[in-house]
Amino acid sequence: MRIIGVIGGSQCTPHQAELAREVGRRLAEQGVVLVCGGGGGVMEAACQGALEAGGTTLGILPGSDRAAANRHVRLAIPTGLGEARNVVIVLTAQALIAVGGEGGTLSEIGMALRHGKRVIALESWELHRPDGTPPSGLVVAQNPEQAVRLALEGEPAAGTN
């Protein structure tokens, strides 16, 4: 079973929501389980797209209330871990697609790269080492179709555990 994470802000622009919805739809069409933080914004839009295409959505919730998941999450996992639940999302996913996002998304990207997970940035953070090179495992996509293709291809990036 392939599981891909979709990460991004709990609040997002209409454009980011549309990108996330399209990512979710395309993941579902590939038979992929979508894992996310289960909240609003990018997470909700991605789950909506996945459900519209008949997919499975898994929300790793920060709190202990299953009912806090957005209405498009079909499998809600309350953790009571707060933002620390981000590491559960990262470790559950085989790769992650970041759409937009703020500091929480940036922390997920860093954790994913640290654990050797491929991260696809779709109008999200673009990171560079001090020498100007991108970190291994971070790839920029131009559109949802490319983001999903990149997330599904190849082996996970080499990490530094």
List the predicted regions and their residue ranges.
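Glycine-rich beta-alpha loop segments
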Residues: 1-58
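C-terminal binding/interaction regions
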Residues: 7-11, 23, 82-155
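General beta-strand structural signal in soluble alpha/beta enzymes
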Residues: 35-37, 59-60, 99, 140
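Short, ordered loop/turn segments at secondary-structure junctions
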Residues: 39-40, 62-65, 124-127
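Short, hinge-like loop/turn segments at secondary-structure boundaries
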Residues: 51-55, 74-78, 116, 137-140
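Short, hydrophobic beta-strand segments that form beta-sheet elements in well-ordered domains
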Residues: 56-61, 119-123
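Glycine-rich oxoanion-binding loops at beta->alpha junctions
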Residues: 60-96
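C-terminal amphipathic helix plus adjacent low-complexity
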Residues: 157-161
